[in-house]
Amino acid sequence: MSCRSYRISPGCGVTRNFSSCSAVAPKTGNRCCISAAPFRGVSCYRGLTGFSSRSLCNPSPCGPRMAVGGFRSGSCGRSFGYRSGGVCGPSPPCITTVSVNESLLTPLNLEIDPNAQCVKYEEKEQIKCLNSKFAAFIDKVRFLEQQNKLLETKWQFYQNRKCCESNLEPLFGGYIEALRREAECVEADSGRLAAELNHVQEAMEGYKKKYEEEVALRATAENEFVVLKKDVDCAYLRKSDLEANVEALVEESSFLKRLYEEEVCVLQAHISDTSVIVKMDNSRDLNMDCVVAEIKAQYDDVASRSRAEAESWYRTKCEEMKATVIRHGETLRRTKEEINELNRMIQRLTAEIENAKCQRAKLEAAVAEAEQQGEAALADARCKLAELEGALQKAKQDMACLLKEYQEVMNSKLALDIEIATYRRLLEGEEQRLCEGVGSVNVCVSSSRGGVTCGGLTYGTTPGRQIVSGPSVTGGSITVMAPDSCSPCQPRASSFTCGSSRSVRFA
């Protein structure tokens, strides 16, 4: 491997190095030789020359070759490019004619600027910074594209959600109508229950009036019972008096009978003990026995009549009293039965009143619960409607914010697109200027894949293309493309390593 280095100055106070290198890879395949010699002369230099050559040779018996050369000179500049390469392979190398350019033997007056390296380093740093910014802009564009896709997805989602919410409005309308119908049914039930309650209250008032009437009748019956009891007591007292009178009369009659018998006995004894001869001068003969018998008969008749009258009167009174007692007992029994019936009716009415009160309380509780449920349902429906309206308003606000953000993102994207287009135009202009300022570029394409990076010069690849880029003599970059490419290599100071273990060193 051999290296040669030359220095040229592309402008006032600026120098740039160009090198020549060759690399040979032992891989069998196509041969790739690249030789480039860019030069740009400026009016402020005298006798400024530049030379650069680079060849990459593969020991393959045959392979495609491509050479590109370019030259651009100013008022007092010149350049010269030289490249030679041979086909390498297992056969002996061919001997080629060597030509010598005598102008190369003359000493060069390069007028090297000591600040060229610093300026070159600054240019490299600026290019790196611009590349970093460009990569950041590319990442930002990709991120904004992702955000754009996300916002579009959200937009579609919110549009579909809006449609769903608009479809929910008739559902809520139907739900509200159903609640309204339920409220109307509850109101109708409330009216019906109120009518039933009024009917029950009227029936209860009727039962109450009947109860009051029955209570009044009971009080009247009790008063009559008291009066009858007084009459019965009076009759019982009279009966007792009459019984006492009867006993007294019986005792008196027995006493009189005993008295009469005693008197008769005394008279008989007196008559028997006294023998009186009475001679009366009368024309009639008085028979005392007949008189006594007659008086006795009269007395017995009067006593029997009195006894019969007393007994008949007593029997009559007893019968009357018994009839009165039976009548009053029957009346009392009927009154008791009526009182019992009234008590049973009162109990039944009391139970019915209690049931009516319980039913009324239940109906009032049901009506109150139905009203509360209706009010709660209406309040819930109103709350849900308010929440849905708030959610709809919030969704609209979010949609407006998202639209605003989307507009800002689109504006940022447009600005970035403009910046990218500006950078693209700048890059295209630099490439055009590089194409105008290149002296000679020779490119040999092989089937191997790789990349070369040297200082500000980058040799990169993509599938099917070969790219060589680097700073131009005008301060830009140069890019060369070929139909085939090799895998990229990472830069290491002033050397690089290819994926096929091939290295190129620039002095």
UniProtKB/Swiss-Prot annotation:
Q: Where is this region: Linker 1?
A: 159-168
Where is the cross-link described as Glycyl lysine isopeptide (Lys-Gly) (interchain with G-Cter in SUMO1)?
229
Q: What keywords is this UniProt entry annotated with?
A: Coiled coil, Intermediate filament, Isopeptide bond, Keratin, Ubl conjugation
Q: Where is this region: Coil 2?
A: 287-430
Q: Where is this region: Tail?
A: 431-507
**Residues covered by region (Coil 1A):** 124-158
Residues forming the IF rod domain are: 123-434
Query: Region Head: start and end of each range?
Result: 1-123
GO CC list: keratin filament
Residues of the region (Linker 12) are: 270-286
Q: Which Pfam families match?
A: Filament, Keratin_2_head
Q: Where is this region: Coil 1B?
A: 169-269
Similarity comment: family membership: Belongs to the intermediate filament family.
More info: There are two types of hair/microfibrillar keratin, I (acidic) and II (neutral to basic).
Q: How does it assemble?
A: Heterotetramer of two type I and two type II keratins.
UniProt protein name: Keratin, type II cuticular Hb5
Q: What organism is this sequence from?
A: Mus musculus (Mouse)
